UniProtKB/Swiss-Prot annotation:
This is Internalin J. Disruption phenotype: No visible effect on colonization of host tissue culture cells; decreased organ colonization in mice. It comes from Listeria monocytogenes serovar 1/2a (strain ATCC BAA-679 / EGD-e). InterPro entries: CDIRP (IPR052574), Cu-Rt/internalin_Ig-like (IPR014755), InlJ_EF-hand (IPR054769), InlJ_Ig-like (IPR054717), LPXTG_anchor (IPR019931), LRR_dom_sf (IPR032675), MucBP_dom (IPR009459). Gene3D superfamilies: 2.60.40.1220, Putative peptidoglycan bound protein (lpxtg motif) (3.10.20.320), Ribonuclease Inhibitor (3.80.10.10). Residues 825-851 form a propeptide. Belongs to the internalin family.
Amino acid sequence: MKTTKIVIASLVSLTMVSNPLLTFAATNDVIDNTTEITTDKETSSTQPTIKNTLKAGQTQSFNDWFPDDNFASEVAAAFEMQATDTISEEQLATLTSLDCHNSSITDMTGIEKLTGLTKLICTSNNITTLDLSQNTNLTYLACDSNKLTNLDVTPLTKLTYLNCDTNKLTKLDVSQNPLLTYLNCARNTLTEIDVSHNTQLTELDCHLNKKITKLDVTPQTQLTTLDCSFNKITELDVSQNKLLNRLNCDTNNITKLDLNQNIQLTFLDCSSNKLTEIDVTPLTQLTYFDCSVNPLTELDVSTLSKLTTLHCIQTDLLEIDLTHNTQLIYFQAEGCRKIKELDVTHNTQLYLLDCQAAGITELDLSQNPKLVYLYLNNTELTELDVSHNTKLKSLSCVNAHIQDFSSVGKIPALNNNFEAEGQTITMPKETLTNNSLTIAVSPDLLDQFGNPMNIEPGDGGVYDQATNTITWENLSTDNPAVTYTFTSENGAIVGTVTTPFEAPQPIKGEDVTVHYLDDKGEKLADDEVLSGNLDDPYTSSAKDIPDYTLTTTPDNATGTFTTTSQSVTYVYTKNIVAAEPVTVNYVDDTGKTLSPSEILNGNVGDTYNATAKQIDGYTLSAEPTNATGQFTSSAQTVNYIYTKNPAPEKGVVEIHYVDEDNKQLNSTTEISGTIGDNYTTEPKTIEGYTLTTTPGNATGTFTTGSQTVTYVYTKNIEAAEPITVNYVDANGKTLAPSETLNGNVGDTYKATAKQIDGYTLSAEPTNATGQFTSSAQTVNYIYTKNTNTDQPLPTKKPTNTTPTKPSNLKTTEVKKASDTLPKTGDSAPWKSALLGVFLSSTALVIWKKKK
């Protein structure tokens, strides 16, 4: 601005000399213009947010467009111009790329004029605000390492690259930037980052925000690099990020990490989380792996043949197998106290080995010729041989237990990079002789050059250099150890040797056994066994035994331990005290008495034994716990509790008595009983029959359902008395010869009637059918004589036509007509004819009279 004013003043002066009138007019114009420019600049510097108002095509200097001189210079440089040069707004809009990083810019006002920008780098300035609302063509934005508290990139829909690392952002909205492939928002104070709309992301870095608790990257299937370390994330799902080759998720609160789908990973840092297990066997491309500061107890790296770096610091690993990791260059197991063994003989490429504070007790380094850095502080190592590690530049084995360092001197590079202070050596325990102890100094105490180290006795010991021994006098077992220190000439090696000691072991005497018996020799209390050294005194003591009184104290109650076993016996007599009774009850589960109680009596301390009873219909539920015990001064009760037996289920057996034709011979018998009980059946004696078949189930067991027992009989063959069949009239007169029927007892007989002329059978006798028996039987067929049909008819008409009841007249059976034709001269036919005529005439006369 000052330059402009000087130029104008010079022009005015020159013009006034040559043409005073013209100069005066021009000077007024120039002064007016200068005043306007000065006013605009001052206004711009005091109010940088107010835009310059120029007409199209008008120009002004970069300093006028951009109030921050540093920013103006950077923009001018982009046009290969000076900040004092003028430029139009249209020209500013043509700039496509601007790199103004590390330029001490504090104000980016004027950036809105650079509407053509596609790439902006304003890294490492002091910018607090950045308005990019007019820079919608931006595809690349790097504004990291500033002091931005807010950044609005929603208008930048073409953005593919965004780096806002190391600012003071508390939120960031990238939902309108779907083309983003790179996003770095690390080292801010974001509490969340939503990248659900940024599916084209290949790199995402949000580490060191410290407050992000959730991160969803499942939509980012193209992601190759992810760094979300130093946050508070508890869950991380990378199963959809199959192209991932670099993952930093260390220093979070992750408890589980599934990497089965991430087989392209070459770099993995999951240290400082809460992982109890992790499976990396699918990650065969892995070259860098850090799982330090996790509570891991197991780790399988056998498939990681390309691994060059492995850190498992401060884990709970019990072991680590490195035999398959032949490309390993860096290995750290610092703080792994539970690892006791480590084999690195297959790791010939090792450059750095750090086993500080590990639990290893030995280490073979003979196959590691490329080893440069070796850290073994605070280990349990007792030996160290680095003679094959000629490239070593740094060795530290402070606070170990190593005596011989002679191999270190073979590597000149270690002379000034070697630390071995604080060695502690514990020697085997020694035995005092007359309270004195002389020990030889360990011949293995050699410095790095193979020389014996300087010895300084402690605890009042005296060192004899000629014999290389140390002697201590008047030692006490109150402090049962002596020490001496060793130091190398250059002081690089310092340590202490401790030798524990003990007094001579005394000779142990044989034990003394103390017995406690009653006057019958029965044991009343547990024996006591006294032990001690030979000739030491012993003292036994009596015991207080309830209900017993000590009656005999042995002579050897006190004495000394000897070379033979001894016995001490205290004898007691039982106190006689009548005890309260023991009542034994027999009840059901409701407390109802089932049988009279029993009362047991005795003296205190005596043993009682209660017994159960057999009670019909009941079963003892359980033996009471106090069925046996001792009488005491208090009354006791023993309860036997019974359960009522359920009603037994019955079975039925039917007994049948039949002949060979299954015909019933006697009534069926039925017996019943409890299922499971035995039954016995008996056959019956049946007259006229003999038992021929006794059934197989004549005896058996009652079962559910009905059973059938069948006895089969055969009829006896016995000639019966005859049966006489008579044919008589009512007076017993024989009308026809009798018939005699014969058969066997039990057989059936059937008598038959006869046709007797002039007689009719009155009735069938009831015993016409029956059975032969051993007694004679008679069957009588009784006949009635037929009425006589040859008597003449009465000629006199009866006067009384009412029939009278016949009296007890004997009926005469009409003689049956002959079945044969009458002979010549017989008169019977005409008599019949006359009788018919007579009857017909009589009937006709009677009929007419009635008419």
